[in-house]
Structures are given as C-alpha cells and as structure tokens.
Amino acid sequence: MNLRRILSYILSALLLTANAGGQDPLNLSSALEQALQNNYGLIISRADLQIAEINNNWGTAGRYPTIGFDVSDNNNYELNSSSYTNRLAAGVGLNWVLFDGFRVNVTKTKLENLKELTSGRLAVEVESTIEDIILVYYSVLLQKEQLKVLETVMNLSEDRYQYELKKQSLGGSVTYNVLQAQNVYLTDKANFLNQEMMVRNTIRNLNYMMGVEPAHTWDFTESFEADTTDYIMADLLSKMKSDNQSLKNQYTNLLLKENETSLQNSAYYPSISLGAGMDYGHSWGYSGGAQYLNNATLTPYGNVRLSFDIYSAGVRKRGVEIARINEEVAQVQIDQMEHALTNELFNLFDFHEVRLELLNVANENLGAAELNLSISEEKYRSGVINSFNYRDIQLIYLSVAYQRLQAVYNLIASKAALTRITGGFLGYASE
C-alpha cells in the first residue's frame, strides 16, 4: 500500500468522523416513534377518527329536540285606496321526535360501530407503517453493508492495479495486464459509487416515511442482525384469529350491516312527535294618513303527531331483504378473509423456516468464501494463479457476501410480516 493510499484513508476517516459528529443517532425505536407521530397517512387517519368521534353523539342520532326561532316583517301598499299595512311576526318552536321505531338507539349504535371501524382502520394503518419503517430502516443497513462489501472488493482491485503498475515499472508486467487490472478496478469503483447513491436514496425514503426533511442524515445505531427465534404454528394461528386487526374490522363491518337491518325494520313502526312553541304577531294599518289598524297577538301552542305508513308499495320489505342479504355477504367476507389470512400465515411461516436455514447456509458459505479470497490473494501475488482466476474468486466472494446480507434482510422481513399478521405491532403502538 503506497503513501497516497494511506493519506487517502486517513483523510476519509477524518471526514467520516466529522460527518458522524453532525449526525443524529437513530435506532429503530426512534424511527418508529417519529413515523407514528409524523407519517402523513397516519395524520389523515387520525383526523378521520376525530370526525367519527365527533359524530358519535346522541344529538347526531336524533335523541334531542330541535328549537328554532323565526321572525318576519311584511309590508303592503294598496295603490287604489292608498292604504299601507305592516305585520311583524315572530315565533319560537320546539320539535321533538318521541318515538321513531327505535331508530335513535339503532343510529347511535351504528355511530359507535362506525367509530370502532375507523379506529380499526387507523390501527391497520399503524401496523402497515410500523412494518414499512422496519423494512426501510433495515434496507438502509442492508445497503450500507453491501457498500462495505463493494469497498472491500474495490480495495482489492486497487491493490491489484497498483501491484501491476509497480511490476510494469520493474519490467515484470506487460501493458495488457495493467489495463486489465485498471478496467477491473474502475468497474468496482463505479459499482461502489452507484451503491453510495442507493444508500442515500434509501435514507431519503426513510425520511419521507418519518415526515423528515430529505437532506437529513442519521447515524444508524442498530446492528444488521436477524432474530433467529423459532415460532410454533399453532400459537401463531391462535394469535392471528384473536388479534388480527383486519379480521376485527371485518367483524365490525358485520355489526354495521346488522345495524342497517334494524334501521330498515324501524320503518314498520309508527312515529310520534311533539311540537310546541309560541307565536307573536303585531299588525299596523294606515289609510289617508290615519291609522285604522293596530292589533297584537300572542299565541302559545302544543301538538302531538302520530304517523304510520300503512302501505309503501313494498319499499320497507325490499329494504329489509336487501339489508339481510348484505349481512350474509358480510359473514361470507369474514370467512373469506379468515381463510385468506390462514393461507398467508402458513406461507409466511414456511418462508420464515426456510429463510432460517438459508441464513445458516449463507453464514457457512461466507466463511468459506472469505478464506478462499484470503488464500487466493497470496497465490496471485506468488504467481500460482493468474489474474482471471483471482477475479473469479473476487466475484464469488461478492456474490456470496450479497447472498448472506440478503438472507439476513429476508429473515427480518419474515419476522415483521409474522408480527403484523398476528397483531403484534399494535401492542408496541399502544405503549
């Protein structure tokens, strides 16, 4: 390694240290906390929940009376008799539906279920956001680890290029070998630069999901390791059926369909309403400049009204029949979702088990590739293998290292998917 390389490494280390000092540390918990607070989709979903909570009110359901006030001033002028009349009228009235076939109670229950469904949809959004943040956070770590692998290969290629240049200066290497080594080094350097761009892009994606400015940089403190915990299928299936939020939402949707059936049935009952209030009127009249009318009235009133639809051309019957069909459809949708989720859970469990084994294979394979790379470097310098053999071994190491990193990421993704489908993320979000 020449002096220029040493100085370059020292300068790079100093720059990295300076940059790291200006970066905020970011572990996975902090990333999740920022996303749950700032994610745009969650902000919108929380606003929807606020609207549902406001609507969940007895006043919205129609339990309470309405009170209104009216005032008017009417003026008339008769041209033939040159008479003028004016009437001022004011009134305050109360209207109250005392009974409407239990519609008020059913409507209130429906509003509560709508709020519950909106809350459930927010929970699904939270689960999706948590899973996405986990995947993107570890995708950043994956890209950074791949960058380290590419840097290792690039440094080896640069060493080989410098080695060929030195041999050429001593008359021990031809131009062809130097150009071939230079081409390999520049290819590896281009791959390294492209990977640096991938790291920056992935960090920007993470910043967007957390609601942070794109240019913000972080010091990622989590280690790129996968949890190798084994799962029991029966336990996962039980948790999924009891805690999966999408399935819970489907049950709430069934309750809403039942509410709609009850509302349609309420049309078969009579309605009783109460009206009460007081009207005030004052009239004036003038003809030929003389007043001929000056009259004031104050009239309280109270009314009770009963109405009942005897025949409505089958509208009520059809409404109830359609509502009951929608109930049956909702039940079928529950069965369909439970079946689909069960299939998905079995697939995810199989993926997890296979990926555990693949990680073990990748770890063993990487150990062999690293040893082979170390041995081949000495063999290349001693002339036992040529540059093409050495390059093949470098590419094998690169491929194996990538496979091992991808195996770690795949196992992390499997665990995240299993946690989501069994409702495990909601416990974290509620803490």
Region annotations inferred by a language model:
Residues 128-241, 348-351, 355, 397:
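Periplasmic alpha-helical coiled-coil/stalk elements that build and connect Gram-negative outer-membrane
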Residues 43-47, 60-61, 98-126, 176, ...:
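Sec/SRP-type N-terminal targeting helices
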Residues 168-172, 380-384, 421:
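A short glycine-centered flexible hinge/capping loop motif at secondary-structure junctions
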Residues 23, 70-100, 107, 220-230, ...:
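Small/polar, glycine/serine/threonine/aspartate-rich low-complexity segments that form flexible
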Residues 23-139, 175, 272, 276, ...:
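Short flexible linkers and secondary-structure junctions
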Residues 21-68, 174, 214-258, 309, ...:
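Bacterial Sec-pathway N-terminal export signals of envelope proteins
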Residues 15-19:
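N-terminal signal peptide c-region/cleavage motif recognized by signal peptidases
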Residues 403-431:
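Acidic, low-complexity, intrinsically disordered peripheral segments
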